[in-house]
Amino acid sequence: MLNYLISAIIFVILDGFYINLIKKYFQKQISRVQGSNIQLRMIPTAITYVFLIFILEYFIISKKENYKTAFLLGFSIYAVYEFTNYSLFKNWTLLTVIIDALWGGILFGLTTFLTNILTRLFK
């Protein structure tokens, strides 16, 4: 349970940092696709985070997989999402696909790496 809590906190902090860093880029991207600004809905956002953190915990952290495997899982999840957008939305860019897929890998890998370090410190 400690692993799950630590990984969830790290995951949300890292993703929040990334979102703030790249916010303007994604605001432009979303505006090109839907013709209006981002309209974040909190409940679906929270559900998304629950699923992503569960996937990370279930497939990586609980099985003591390394950060490289976590990177591949995160990259794959985000790449599927981004290539789906790229296939469906005329104005979705390949650059967005690449940036976000790489971020998914970094997010999963770094969360795993930091969770492993912090879990050892708290035991």
List the model feature ranges, each with a label.
Residues 1-123:
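Juxtamembrane/disordered regions of integral membrane proteins
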